[in-house]
Design a protein with these regions (language model features):
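Short, strongly hydrophobic alpha-helical membrane anchors
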Residues: 1-8
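C-terminal TM-helix exit segments that contain a strictly Trp-centered aromatic cap at the helix terminus
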Residues: 87-95
Length: 143
């Protein structure tokens, strides 16, 4: 992504929507396994959780910006871990102030920050972001 062309913007928009839907599917599936019934995990009308789409777009852009530097799996994991943590905290804070409600609360889990982010999810986001970026890179190299 040397320059921000229409093709790059379309790619990022596609990533946003695909991963918003996949994130919603994952959350609904996890809650179905936990409670044995359907629970809509989105706060919007429709099957998507925009925080997942925003996260993957953020990771993709940051890895692209830093690609001129030494790029590694560790760098991608760090960007995913830290970036998703900042994004999740900011979104949680905004939603609480704007709508006077909390969409998630990790306060009962160890190693959380104000109940907004939790180390366990950050590790999963780091791994997930790394897997997605590596898969996308591998796919682009083969194309």
């Amino acid at each position: 992504m040397d320059n921000l062309s229409l093709q790059h913007i379309c790619y990022l928009v596609l990533l946003f929507f695909v991963f918003s839907v996949l994130g919603w599917c994952m959350e609904v599936l996890l809650k179905y396994i936990q409670y044995h019934r359907f629970i809509n995990r989105g706060f919007l009308i429709g099957p998507y959780c925009p925080i997942y789409g925003s996260g993957i777009v953020f990771i993709t852009v940051m890895v692209s910006i830093l690609s001129g530097m030494e790029s590694s799996v560790g760098t991608t994991f760090s960007i995913s871990f830290i970036g998703c943590g900042i994004l999740e905290y900011a979104v949680s804070y905004y939603l609480e102030k704007r709508f006077h409600a909390r969409w998630w609360d990790y306060s009962t889990k160890p190693m959380n920050l104000h109940g907004r982010i939790w180390i366990g999810n950050l590790i999963l986001f780091g791994i997930g972001g790394t897997l997605v970026i590596e898969a996308v890179s591998y796919t682009h190299l083969r194309a």
